[in-house]
Amino acid sequence: MPLYEFTFIAQQGLTQYELEGLVKGLSSLLTKNGAELLKYEYWGLLDFAYTIDKMNKGHYCMIYIKATPSSMDEFKRKVRLNEDVLRFLCLKKDKLPKGDSLMIQANQV
C-alpha cells in the first residue's frame, strides 16, 4: 500500500477536545476503509497569510497514512464535506520520515 502525507487546517474556533474528536473521527474513517494511521503531528494554532472564510488562524495537523488509492479517494471526499476542515493537502510519499517534521523542530527551538 502506498504512503500518504495528509496535512489539514482545522477551524480556529475548535477547542483542543473538539480537535482531538475531529482527528479521532478522521482516523476511524481511515481504519474503516482498511487504511493504517502511522503518525500524527499537531503543529499548533498558526496565523494565515490571508483570511480564509473570515478566519485569521487555524489548527495545523499532519497525518501519515498507509492506504490504497481508492480508500484515499473516499477519505478525501468525506473530508471535503467536513465543515471543520478549512483546507487540506494530500501527497504521496516514498518513505516515512524519521523523527519530527521541520515544523515541530522549529517550535522546539
UniProtKB/Swiss-Prot annotation:
A single BP term in Gene Ontology: translation
Gene3D superfamilies in the record: 3.30.70.60
Alphabetically ordered keywords of this record: Ribonucleoprotein, Ribosomal protein, RNA-binding, rRNA-binding
CDD domains: bS6
GO cellular component assignments: cytoplasm; ribonucleoprotein complex; ribosome
Functional note: Binds together with bS18 to 16S ribosomal RNA.
PANTHER family: MITOCHONDRIAL 28S RIBOSOMAL PROTEIN S6, SMALL RIBOSOMAL SUBUNIT PROTEIN BS6M
Listed NCBIfam families: S6
Family, similarity comment: Belongs to the bacterial ribosomal protein bS6 family.
HAMAP family recorded: Ribosomal_bS6 (MF_00360)
Protein name: Small ribosomal subunit protein bS6
Originating species: Ehrlichia canis (strain Jake)
Designated gene of the protein: rpsF
